[in-house]
Design a protein with these regions (language model features):
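A short beta-strand motif characteristic of beta-propeller blades
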Residues: 29-34, 77-81, 126, 134-138, ...
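Short loop/turn segments immediately following beta-strands, especially the blade-tip
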Residues: 20-25, 68-73, 114-121, 171-177, ...
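Conserved small/polar residues in nucleotide/adenosyl-binding loops
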Residues: 268-274
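Blade-loop segments of beta-propeller domains
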Residues: 34-93
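Beta-rich, blade/repeat-based domains predominating
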Residues: 37-47, 84-95, 131-152, 187-204, ...
């Protein structure tokens, strides 16, 4: 079995590197590099379709590149989209690869694209511009949508706005794939929402806040409700920290949260509070 991993290099003149993992000797080896898009900020793969999306830069402008994953993990460049206002901080694809959500941290904007791989074409079909600020004058002078995540059944997209201390809920109509704004949730001032992780059972959602290093637990099956808040730091830690990422294991048994400053990865068991 061949295991291929794609990584993005966040520096000029570098793009995507494909690695092969050898299960026998436990080593990685470089297969190839792709440079259609450079200074990578995020990579995203569609779950049920063979597409890899890469956010980065080209000639000093923001760019999204679309690749088809073909045999043996090779990448075929399909198309791209140039965004002159800035660069993207996060990408999220629908499972079938037909919709792509992109957040632009610097401009306060979230773009939604229709992916037509047969043409190939990446067409922007909707945009949301957010406003707001928070008490942290260095990091929250304006809206900064850091990420967009889709719920497991893909009826809901959640935008984490680090600058405005908000979560924005977008509903997705399944047949037409149209997206509309539903409501917002106000977080604790100064916490800085960063990333979202959904439990695979479709009942629970977890928010990681960058500035306060906390984990919020929500129920959302019937209504949106915050039911718990815990620290993402060990009790013994003293110092500055910026929380980084949060993930739920595929079986739903474990929740992972990483930190920069404390420089660790925390493991929580039984993340679903049942």
């Amino acid at each position: 079995m061949r295991t291929v991993l794609y990584t993005g290099i966040h520096q000029k003149n570098n793009g995507i590197i494909a690695w092969e993992y050898n299960w026998e000797n436990k080593l990685f080896s470089i297969l190839f590099e792709k440079s259609e898009v450079q200074n990578i900020t995020y990579l995203c793969k569609s779950t049920d379709a063979p597409y890899l999306f890469a956010a980065g830069e080209y000639d000093g402008q923001g760019m999204i590149a679309v690749y088809r994953i073909i045999s043996e993990g090779e990448l075929q460049f399909l198309t791209s989209y140039i965004y002159k206002k800035g660069t993207f901080s996060h990408l999220q694809s629908s499972k079938d690869g037909r919709l792509l959500f992109a957040s632009c941290y610097g401009t306060g904007e979230v773009l939604i694209f229709s992916v037509v791989a047969e043409l190939p074409k990446l067409e922007m079909v909707k945009s949301f511009m957010f406003e707001g600020s928070g008490p942290n004058v260095k990091r929250q002078e304006s809206s900064h949508p850091h990420s967009v995540y889709l719920s497991p059944e893909e009826r809901l997209a959640i935008v984490s706005d680090l600058g405005a201390d908000r979560l924005y809920m977008l509903s997705i109509e399944q047949k037409s794939k149209t997206v509309k704004f539903e409501f917002e949730w106000k977080a604790t001032p100064g916490c800085g929402p960063r990333h979202i992780a959904f439990h695979p059972d479709g009942k629970w959602c977890y928010l990681l806040t960058e500035l306060s290093s906390e984990i919020y637990v929500f129920t959302y099956e019937e209504s949106w409700k915050n039911i718990q808040k815990i620290s993402a730091l060990p009790e013994s830690f003293v110092g500055e920290n910026l929380a980084a990422d949060i993930l739920v294991s595929k079986d739903g048994k474990y929740l992972y949260a990483s930190n920069r400053g404390c420089n660790n990865c925390l493991l929580y068991t039984s993340p679903s509070p049942r």
